């Protein structure tokens, strides 16, 4: 099973993903945890370019193709091999991030981006996508505090430096895209405590796996 986590900056994707990974491992599932950009050796180099605060002059088109290169390598070297081994793959961001950030955020055509991504991933789309949703102001405050705390403000702060208007477009784009692809999307309220977010995510995945023994309520919602 291939599960991706999406959301604006500071939405808590990494925390929710790690909580889900622990739950899956406790139930005997093999789990591969990965991320974009940076899930492969080449991807780590591309991540340093894409997220560096000093690279504010990257054009939307150049940004797009750097992300596509990262993704193609990631799928070939990490995602497909793990799925072939029967593992549950959890990815912090995937192709939907490009559709939303470069499409709704930067103004490129989302449907064109979907087609480009189809080529990059060889048609491999997630079985389930969890969108962690909250207001952009709250997410940015979280993300900026995290980057400063971890000493990553310059190395990984390029998107946090974007305007509030940009992040508002991204958030609205995510909700629009989730509604268009409601069959695989579940939206979780990311304003809750981390523990409550993990509980909701576990409930969603337990239902998808048919794990009725988890005792967790499913409280995500499907896009229309």
Swiss-Prot record:
GO terms for cellular component: cytosol. Its EC number is 2.7.4.9. Keywords: ATP-binding, Kinase, Nucleotide biosynthesis, Nucleotide-binding, Transferase. ATP binds at residues 7-14. The keyword Plastid does not apply. It comes from the Bacteria. GO terms for biological process: dTDP biosynthetic process; dTTP biosynthetic process; dUDP biosynthetic process. It catalyses: dTMP + ATP = dTDP + ADP. GO terms for molecular function: ATP binding; dTMP kinase activity. It is an enzyme of class 2 (transferase). Belongs to the thymidylate kinase family. Phosphorylation of dTMP to form dTDP in both de novo and salvage pathways of dTTP synthesis. NCBIfam families: DTMP_kinase. This is Thymidylate kinase. It comes from Nitratidesulfovibrio vulgaris (strain ATCC 29579 / DSM 644 / CCUG 34227 / NCIMB 8303 / VKM B-1760 / Hildenborough) (Desulfovibrio vulgaris).
């Amino acid at each position: 099973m291939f599960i991706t986590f999406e959301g604006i900056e500071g939405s808590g994707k990494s925390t929710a993903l790690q909580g889900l990974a622990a739950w899956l491992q406790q139930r005997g599932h093999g789990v591969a945890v990965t991320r974009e950009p940076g899930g492969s050796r080449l991807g780590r180099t591309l991540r340093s370019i894409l997220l560096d605060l000093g690279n504010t002059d990257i054009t939307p088109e150049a940004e797009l193709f750097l992300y596509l290169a990262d993704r193609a390598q990631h799928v070939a070297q990490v995602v497909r091999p793990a799925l072939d081994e029967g593992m549950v793959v959890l990815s912090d961001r995937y192709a939907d991030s490009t559709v939303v950030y470069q499409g709704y955020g930067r103004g490129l055509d989302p449907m064109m981006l979907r087609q480009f991504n189809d080529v990059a991933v060889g048609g491999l789309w997630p079985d389930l996508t969890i969108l962690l949703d909250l207001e952009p102001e709250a997410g940015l405050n979280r993300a900026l505090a995290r980057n400063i705390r971890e000493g990553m403000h310059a190395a990984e702060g390029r998107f946090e430096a974007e305007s509030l208007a940009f992040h508002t477009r991204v958030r609205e784009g995510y909700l629009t895209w989730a509604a268009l692809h409601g069959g695989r999307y579940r939206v979780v309220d990311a304003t809750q405590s981390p523990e409550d977010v993990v509980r909701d995510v576990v409930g969603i995945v337990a239902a998808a796996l048919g794990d009725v023994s988890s005792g967790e309520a499913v409280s995500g919602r499907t896009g229309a």
